[in-house]
Amino acid sequence: MLDVALRNLAFAYDRGFALRDVTLTFARSTHTALIGPPACGASTLLRLIAGALKPSAGDVILGQRRVNDVKASARPLLAVTAAIDVPGRWSVQHVLVAAVHTRTLDREDRHREYELAVDKWSLGPLLDRKMRTLSDTEAVRVQLARIELLRPAVLLADRLLERVSPSARTQLADAFYRTMRVSGTTVISAPCSTDELAYTDRVVVLHEGNVVQSGVAAEVFARPASDAAAIATGDVDVIPVVVRGNTVESVIGAWEVDPPPFQGSGVALVRPSDFTPPAPGEDSDFVFGVEEAGFAGGRWIAHGMLTGGVRLRVELPREANVHKGRLMALRYDPARFRLLPRELAPLQPTVPTDVVPPLGETR
């Protein structure tokens, strides 16, 4: 299998640079996810590696070979999306047979791999169906079987699972990425959800065409270098803060930090799961007013507005008594927060929750 290297890679559209000075190495037989906010440059980077776009500067290296001038069809890789690149009139069987026939196997081995793929991806009842008659999830299952049969050295997957039903996505992702790991394929993906980060060896965070952070997904989640890195790895609340000495002041209370990471204004990047209801007898850190609440994924998700128009999203255990309009006492561990310096405008008072006029002024 092959490793992939990018050296000072840049690409510009007419409106400006989409990627700037990207230098990365993707080790062979590993899975790296390119993540970031919308228009971060992940899909553009995959297209540059695939050969669908030509770099404005820098090099793409596959193994030991610089491939900038090598046609996309001649590069030893496979680039895929959720849309399978075969005629809609083809049957599922035709797609799979065409894939396995690209391999240098004898007839018996080809037939065995074909049968294993059909069974693994539950495609038996679909073999005679034409591709254009399949549901989105069925078509993606065919795509995954096809990729397994092609056995690419390098796989570039751009939102491969975005059309899969949410109820089937986790199961298919687990089966597919384990298959790629066993086969030794070097996978570079732009995932369609943060759930897919569970199957990666590393994530690379892109923002406005620049690499802003890379590392193991758990490390980036816990210590994001920016809002972009925090958002790319999970839900996040951005809470304005002011650091004075060793004290951090915010709309959810104040806490001590030693040593302080900066002085003056900034933000705290806070995960919704960092908040918990106090146990009986425990003090709370602040009171949260629930404006909207819903139940999903085995927990409550509540939204509310704090002083100065700061919106807060919290995740609460399923046994919590959560409903619209309820005031809830919450606790947090500030050691879990990520503090970043930032110039901020003063918070604007909100009415009527935060500013109550004197009684005489209301008459």
Question: Where are the language model's segments positioned?
Answer:
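Helix-to-loop junction immediately C-terminal to a conserved catalytic motif
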Residues: 50
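ABC ATPase NBD coupling module
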Residues: 66-78, 102, 220
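Q-loop/switch helix immediately C-terminal to the Walker
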Residues: 89-102
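Conserved ABC ATPase "signature" region
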Residues: 109-126
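Conserved ABC ATPase "signature" C-loop
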Residues: 209-210
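ABC ATPase "signature
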Residues: 214-215, 223
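Glycine/charge-rich catalytic "coupling/switch" loops of P-loop NTPases
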Residues: 252-294, 320-363
